[in-house]
């Protein structure tokens, strides 16, 4: 593990560096408070800090306060060194943000075990961060496909529409539905159906830009949100996705399972400004036509469909219900 040692006394610094290196630490040295703070800024892997109280430019107390007043992640565990052993000094050091306090001259064994305790704190904090990130990911993503879930993708669409209104840029929405998916489940089983859903999600994700949003609305329904994409381009993307989904079957347990998708497209440049729910309903109407026109194709929403959507939206909330 990397550790930062900040002390202005060359003899003390050399002695502490010798101990720390002998215990397996990768040591970075600083001679004053300002260089210590710069070292932490330059290398986020420095998670342990042994810092002297009395130093030029910025002392140990100022360093502690600067760290605690800055970003709290990644967490830096601070051991404050000083010749001051009065209880009020110890309280002042801990109150400034130090995690531990060691009075000079240091006992090497005591420093070693205190740093070991610091490492445990850092490891626990890292586990907490990973658990929090995992929970956040699970809350926003579909468990089967890894795509954004319904709530998350609608939230992204809402944000993109706000950005688009500021920039005057179009947004396209693609609503897709796998064709004859019930037949796939009935013929090959639900495990095979899940494999088809995962493969469809992979191809949809691979077929759009890195900053486009792809989500699973539920069942065999998918949605793509394409910022800065007009209706003509959105339709071309949808047609490409239809080809991608139908060209190659998915292999499952030695069986090749053919599949395809129908897609409806609606874009803000077709109808001027549009709400999230209006775009989705217009795209869904185009999807319905694509299904009835023979499936495995993409169709663009027409003005009549959008007018019908506008009439309906006047009697409904602005948001799409969760389910």
Predicted regions located by residue number:
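Catalytic core regions of nucleotide second-messenger enzymes
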Residues: 216, 245-262
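Charged docking surfaces used in two-component/phosphorelay signaling
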Residues: 14-22
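Active-site-proximal structural segments of metal-dependent nucleotidyl cyclase/transferase enzymes
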Residues: 154-188, 204, 215
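Signal-transducing coiled-coil linker helices
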Residues: 93, 107-143, 151-162, 212-213, ...
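Hydrophobic framework residues that shape the active-site pocket
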Residues: 181, 200, 214-217, 222, ...
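Catalytic-core segments of nucleotide cyclases and related cyclic-nucleotide turnover enzymes
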Residues: 235, 268-300, 305-321
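Conserved nucleotide-binding and Mg2+-coordinating catalytic segments in signaling enzymes
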Residues: 136-155, 176-190, 198
